[in-house]
Structures are given as C-alpha cells and as structure tokens.
C-alpha cells in the first residue's frame, strides 16, 4: 500500500522535529468509544515496568486480555498485582509468561506456548536494551544489543506471524508492533558497507564503543526487517508495523545507565523534555489497535499516532538493495527455526 507522508524522511530525522514532537505534541488516548478490545488477546514484551507496564494497563482498560512477557517471572507477577489494583480480579485476564530475548531457545519456547492460545490479536514487542559497555551474547557471539533488539525480535516476529494468521477471527487481521526509536534515524550504520553485514556485529566496535550509534543501528535493522517482511506477508494474514513513543521519563530503558554518567544525563534530559510513560504508551496502543490507521500500518512506522517516515536509510537510493541483503542474511541466521519456510507459507 503506497503511503504519502506529510514530512520528508530527512526532516523527520531532524532535531527540530524531535523537540517539537516532545514539547508540543501529545498523542490522544484511545478509549472504548474508539475501539473495544473485549475478548481479544495481546502480548506485551518487557511488560514488568515503564512503557511496557503502562501499555498493558491501557490495553486492559480497552477490555483486552494481556500476557505479560518478562525475563524474570517474579517481577512479572509483581507487575500483574499492580495492574490488578482497582480492577475486578475475576473479570481481568492477565497472565505472566517467561521470555528471555538473550536466548533463541527461550523465544522458540515462548512461540510454541503461544500456539496454545485460543486467539491472538496483538503483540507489542517493547523489550529491548542499550549497553553502556560492549558485551557479547554467549550463545550466538553477537553484540548484545544487536542480538536482543534485532535478531531475537526478528525471530519472535517470524514465529508469531503464522500464529496470528491461524488464530485470525473475522476479517480483521491482528497486528505485530515492533518498538523502534528516534535514534534509528540518526544511526550511520557504517556496517552496511560490509559483505556480509551481520558477522561484523560479532567483532569489537572500532575505533571505540559507541553505545548510542549501536543502539540506533539495532533499531534501524528492525525497520529494515519490518519493511521487507511486509513485502512478503499479506496484510490479510497479519499486519506488521513499527513504532516510536519518543523520549519518556520512567522508561525501563534507563536501567543500564544507572551508576554511569550517561544514566544521570538521560534521567535529567528525559525529565526536562520527555513524556510520561502513560503518554508514550498511547503511541504503541494506536499502532496496535487504532481502527482508523487500519491496514495502512503494514510495513510502516507509527509516531505520534500517525504514519511517519522511517530512517532516511530505508529510502536512500544507494541503499535500495540493502533491505533485501539484510533480509537474506537474517533468514540465514534464523534458519535453525525454519524462518524462510515460515515466511514462504505466508507469502502474498
């Protein structure tokens, strides 16, 4: 579906646009007058605090059953109790499922469990991290933010997509929402010039570790993946989109920076210019459930409750084959799970 934007990718990536959005734009909440999610089921990853917890809260307000996907079950249970406050416990459906994105095995196990659901309508993939220090994932050798933010989420999307198709009720497809970031638009992504690309993320970053650049790169990889996936998967099967809530104070993302200067700076800046998690989560819910956006979200990017351009790299003429190249490398990486065969079964 061709989409016309009210701003160019370059202007969308600009600092002035960012500050205008942060200071002067407040995405409206969705209410049951807009959409009633009664009887529907949603998965929210990274749901034990911050944006994930608030997203779960808003979905519950719309009548949805919510599955909290968390790395530590005890924290998920604490979040569940918090969400139940002021609600009828008998009428509120909240489940806690373990999910550790640092482990492909955990992702596969989570998806297997999702097959047992009677229906699945929404998945908001909010879990992610940034690393102040460079660390590698022991099981795969990839730098941790690339493994968690990109590869594990790409695996989860791939495994969930056929479940959405099989659990589809009526004529309205479900939606998978991958959370992105403003930093995706600023990433230089110099690794794209390598051949192949993904193995470079198993090497030490040179000349020095740049956590903001690497975090942004992990997010732009996700944008490429969603763009390529939407070319191959029919919107009648499942809608796949990406979204960004902007800078939010109280986000769990800041936990890695605690005890470091960057953590202090992040907290100060987010307090000065950031939205509350309550406002930020509204964007996720719009991407996942706004009926006005509908099928137009497929393969697109939702910001401030509207469709906006992704990173300029997605549209750069010299990089038009980059998405296809990344796709093939990612399918190779996830071949152990039959990724290509799964996507082929969903091909338009």
Curated annotation (Swiss-Prot):
NADP(+) binds at residues 51, 75, 100, 126, 215, 219. Pfam families: adh_short. Disruption phenotype: Does not affect the production of flavoglaucin and congeners. Its EC number is 1.1.1.-. One of its GO terms (molecular function) is oxidoreductase activity. It comes from the Eukaryota. InterPro entries: NAD(P)-bd_dom_sf (IPR036291), SDR_fam (IPR002347). Pathway: Secondary metabolite biosynthesis. The active site is at 180 (proton donor), 215 (proton donor), 219 (lowers pka of active site tyr). Keywords: NADP, Oxidoreductase. The PKS fogA releases the carboxylic acid (8E,10E,12E)-3,5,7-trihydroxytetradeca-8,10,12-trienoic acid as its product, as well as derivatives with one and two double bonds. Belongs to the short-chain dehydrogenases/reductases (SDR) family. This is Short-chain dehydrogenase fogG. It comes from Aspergillus ruber (strain CBS 135680).
């Amino acid at each position: 579906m061709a989409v016309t934007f009210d701003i160019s990718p370059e202007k969308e990536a600009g600092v002035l646009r960012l500050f205008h959005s942060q200071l002067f734009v407040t995405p409206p909440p969705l209410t049951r007058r807009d959409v009633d999610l009664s009887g529907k089921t949603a998965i929210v990853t990274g749901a034990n605090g911050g944006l994930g917890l608030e997203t779960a809260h808003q979905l519950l307000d719309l009548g949805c059953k919510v599955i909290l996907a968390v790395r530590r079950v005890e924290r998920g249970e604490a979040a569940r109790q918090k969400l139940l406050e002021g609600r009828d416990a008998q009428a509120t459906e909240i489940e806690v499922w373990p999910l550790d994105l640092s482990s492909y095995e955990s992702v596969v196990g989570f998806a297997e469990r999702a097959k047992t659901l009677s229906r699945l309508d929404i998945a908001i993939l909010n879990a992610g991290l940034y690393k102040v220090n460079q660390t590698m994932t022991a099981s795969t050798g990839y730098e941790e933010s690339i493994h968690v933010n990109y590869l594990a989420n790409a695996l989860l999307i791939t495994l969930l997509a056929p479940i959405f198709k099989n659990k589809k009720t009526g004529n309205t497809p479900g939606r998978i929402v991958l959370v992105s970031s403003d930093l995706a638009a600023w990433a230089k992504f110099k690794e794209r010039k390598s051949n192949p690309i993904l193995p470079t993320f198993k090497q030490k970053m040179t000349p020095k570790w740049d956590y903001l650049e690497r975090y942004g790169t992990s997010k732009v990889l996700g944008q490429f993946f969603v763009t390529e996936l939407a070319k191959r998967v029919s919107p009648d099967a499942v809608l796949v989109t990406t979204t960004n809530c902007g800078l939010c104070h109280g986000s769990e993302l800041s936990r890695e920076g605690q005890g470091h200067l960057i953590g202090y700076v992040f907290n100060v800046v987010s307090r000065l210019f950031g939205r509350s998690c309550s406002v930020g989560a509204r964007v996720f819910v719009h991407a996942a459930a706004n009926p006005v956006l509908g099928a137009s979200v497929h393969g697109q990017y939702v910001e401030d409750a509207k469709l906006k351009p992704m990173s300029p790299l997605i549209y750069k003429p010299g990089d038009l084959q980059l998405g296809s190249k990344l796709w093939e490398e990612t399918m190779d990486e996830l071949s152990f799970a039959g990724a290509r065969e799964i996507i082929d079964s969903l091909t338009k």
